[in-house]
């Protein structure tokens, strides 16, 4: 769960700094961690 929070924080900071490459990778991290958490919840 802390990885998801960190990915969201990174995305917000990248957006504020207009670092579009980091913003893109942070969004991928958010999706990746979110899917991982859902997988654990549903037993995948």
Curated annotation (Swiss-Prot):
Gene Ontology terms: biological process: defense response to bacterium; killing of cells of another organism
InterPro entries, A to Z: PSMbeta
A GO molecular-function descriptor: toxin activity
GO cellular component labels: extracellular region
Pfam families xrefs: PSMbeta
Keywords, in A-Z order: Antibiotic, Antimicrobial, Cytolysis, Hemolysis, Secreted, Toxin, Virulence
Compartments, as annotated in UniProt: Secreted
Family that this chain belongs to: Belongs to the staphylococcal hemolytic protein family.
The protein's role, per its UniProt record: Has hemolytic activity and also inhibits the growth of gonococci.
Protein name: Antibacterial protein 3 homolog
Species: Staphylococcus haemolyticus (strain JCSC1435)
